[in-house]
Amino acid sequence: MGAYLTLIYGVIVIAALVIIGLIKFIFAQDKGNEKMQQISDAIKEGAMAFLNRQYKTIASLALIVAVIIVVANYYGHLSEGSSQALSFALHVGFAFITGAFCSALSGYIGMYMAVNSNIRAAAGARSGLNRALQIALKGGAVTGLAVTALSLFGVATLFLAYGGLSGQDELIKEAPSLIVGFGFGASFVALFAQLGGGIYTKAADVGADLVGKVEAGIPEDDPRNPAVIADLVGDNVGDCAGRGADLFESTAAENIGAMILGVGLYPIFGWKGILFPLVARAIGIIASIIGIFFVNTKDESKDPMIALNKGYFVTTVVNLIALFFAVKVMLSGHLPDGRPVNYLLLYGAVVTGVILSYIFVFLTDYYTSVNKRPVQEIAKASTTGAATNIITGTSVGMESTALPVIFISAAIYIAYKLGEMAIPHIGTAGLYGTAIATMGMLSTTAYILAMDTFGPITDNAGGITEMSGAPEEIRRVTDRLDACGNTTKALTKGYAIGSAALATFLLFSAYLDEVKKILGKPIDSWFPVDIGKPEVFIGAFIGAMIVYLFSSTAIRAVGKAAQYVILEVRRQFREIPGIMEGTAKPDYARAVDIVTKGALKEMVIPGLIVVVTPILVGVILGKEAAAAFLMIGTISGVILALYLNNGGGAWDNAKKFIELGNYGGKGSDAHKASVVGDTVGDPFKDTAGPSLHVLIKLISTITLVFVALFR
């Protein structure tokens, strides 16, 4: 085990050193003129103020939940003896606090780097496209590497502390079950970070657009708009802090779920089957570092997306090569009858996961790109009014769920069968195959997250150049990067929901394993869920309902918070003379403060609904009903998230397609109709949709933590 631990912690150290180097590179860059710095400072101040207040709210809720976890697990394990029950409960409670802290820290790092990179990317645009591209991507890379390294460090350290280093088989096998609290803590913070950030960003965006662009007739990012700084702050709190916590949770949950499944194969692989997910994560970090340094564009006229795709391709190739050797060395055990495990089939599961990630990126691009049929259909429908825009956009969103579901299903089936063929006649072999496929898909997480954070950095850079009155040639550079950033944000949402779907299949399987352990059944036996029982049917019904109820409250929260912003912007236009003439400065801080309070107030109820419901289902209706709740909740959540993400993205880009000069261009009736569709789609793609990625993993980790209480 020593050599593998050296590899894991060695990679964490390398990631830390690279992060330090990237931070030094970014902070050494020029910060532009005084006006640019003033705008950047206002964005930074607003973003960090929101994050600090949000984390105070989350921390108070997390402490209450930690106490409930300890008490629930103590009483749930009392049959094993008082001292053993207390030890188990404290281990799970501490893991929850650790996961919550690491998730919050990853969000903080993402936010801090974004608000310090945006001004430097804007200033770098004066030296050309490549300089600005390098600054923005490396700012995003700090987030990507920090999130994945923190996740790896947290899971690995807890595993070792909870028995992984003991040398005793029973303690090593028990350790993954004790660290499920880490996944729940990560999920808990991620839900509120994504939800609160999503409400903030869309409330500010909708408020700024409706009063600024529609009522006052001023352009986007115009310094006369009192909500413009709040809008730029929103780009960071939703896409940096929120997505950072989301993918931190995905990697942590996938690692823990795969480690629990590895316990079932202990007679064949020993501790290597449990440790393999951590080694795979370490390999992914190194591959992402290599890919990041391959990104550059010597030809300034080329689409910067080509350079980013090159880095993604390099990351994938390095991953595939390194994971082949990892599978060969770690998963080449022997079956009970003496035959060797076919590691090539297990490697096939890795390739399946990698291919699925590419397919998801391609499908998301197809349904949200201005160059493709779906978006152009919505743009054409806008020529006959807002109603036909909404009807066509809804249709596109619904259509966009079909192919992703088919490919997810195919990937799960193929990976499951490859696992069964590689390790025949072992009950959990197929599930381990799907775990390996999930590792393949998530192996590029650090690079994907770098691309995602690249989006808000370039968006802010464009806003800063616009508000500071920078020359037209600099704005052209930042506009090209901003367009590229919009693409990366859309693509990473597709990647996030695909990885969430695979990760939750693992967690569902891990839940069934935990139930078998509690019932004293062999780990390779079956836990039957009788769909004919009314409790099971009711649990499934509630699982489907909770997804829609949560989305409803999240979307409504955006509407309520946006009303606060709209009223404030109207008040300032009315009461502060000279704003429209440019002779008086709007009160940006007031608008930021109002949307901050509104977002934090509105995020609590949707979040609590998700946390409480699965516990009540398990306690009142039982373990089988909780399993049905998980399965149907996951299926409904994935499909609805695809609809919301892709539908919202398509509405957004239909507006951009018209703004390029099609169907009358800006100011035309078609453009006005497309603005309505874009406004409807905003809370879909940036609030409810991304929050569902977290929800489907959260309900799985909650049931894992509280399963001992279920009847």
Swiss-Prot record:
The places in or outside the cell where this protein is found are:
Cell membrane
Keyword annotations = Calcium, Cell membrane, Hydrogen ion transport, Ion transport, Magnesium, Membrane, Metal-binding, Translocase, Transmembrane, Transmembrane helix, Transport
**Any idea which positions bind Mg(2+) 2?**
235, 459
Keyword Cell inner membrane present in the record's keywords: the answer is no
Membrane spanning stretches:
7-27, 58-78, 85-105, 145-165, 179-199, 251-271, 274-294, 311-331, 343-363, 403-423, 431-451, 495-515, 535-555, 602-622, 624-644, 690-710
Q: Which GO terms describe its molecular function?
A: diphosphate hydrolysis-driven proton transmembrane transporter activity; inorganic diphosphate phosphatase activity; magnesium ion binding
Residues under site feature: Important for ion transport: 239, 246, 686, 697
Please name the Pfam families in this protein's record: H_PPase
Gene Ontology cellular-component terms for this entry are:
plasma membrane
Q: Which cofactor does it need?
A: Mg(2+)
Positions of Ca(2+) binding:
652, 678, 682
Which catalysed reactions does the entry list for this protein? diphosphate + H2O + H(+)(in) = 2 phosphate + 2 H(+)(out)
UniProt EC number: 7.1.3.1
| Entry binding sites for Mg(2+) 1 | 205, 209
Q: What class of enzyme is it?
A: translocase
Q: Where does substrate bind?
A: 202, 685
Provide the site residues for: Determinant of potassium independence: 489
Please give, as recorded in its UniProt entry, the membrane topology of this protein: Multi-pass membrane protein
Q: Which family does it belong to?
A: Belongs to the H(+)-translocating pyrophosphatase (TC 3.A.10) family. K(+)-insensitive subfamily.
Quaternary structure and interacting proteins, as annotated: Homodimer.
Role played = Proton pump that utilizes the energy of pyrophosphate hydrolysis as the driving force for proton movement across the membrane. Generates a proton motive force.
Q: What is this protein called?
A: K(+)-insensitive pyrophosphate-energized proton pump
